Amino acid sequence: MHEYEHTQPGTFMRAMTGLWVVIFVVGSVVMLALGGQEVAGAVIPGIVMLAVFTAIIVALFHSLTVRISRSDIALSFGVGLIRKRFPIGDIRSVRTVRNRWYNGWGIRKIRGGWLYNVSGFDAIEIQLKNERKYRIGTDQPKKLFAAVESALAGSS
């Protein structure tokens, strides 16, 4: 049973993907209109490969789900192929933080640890007993912080 579960949509990722789709569709139509069949034969395979690549990235990173149980914090991106778990017993501390804009989104090595994020700048930072730090992006920093604190108190 989960004591906390929340899925944050990757709003920025979705918006940027939509923008890229529009740009590629308009660009493709213009190139086909100006270049005819010769251009179509050269351009369409590239467009299809780019569309497939974009679809894979969106499927993998369109959201971040955080589940907290008595035993662990479980993260999963998008369709669930990319996951990470943190046993509650391994966590030393938790605090709310605000990421800088240049930390970006996705899974990133940042100064002092790792970041797991799909949208926005708010996060919690957990420090493990082995001194490693991880930031988990969220649009519910207070609720997520309270849920982790509750799980930590329950494990003591």
Task: Map each language-model feature to its residues.
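Structural signal for membrane-spanning alpha-helices in multi-pass inner-membrane proteins
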Residues: G27-M31, F53-L60
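N-terminal membrane-targeting/pre-transmembrane regions
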Residues: M1-V39, L115, F121-A123, K133, ...
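Transmembrane-cytosolic junction motif
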Residues: I56-D72, S76
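Non-transmembrane, membrane-adjacent beta-strand/coil modules in membrane-associated proteins
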Residues: L60, S76-Q140
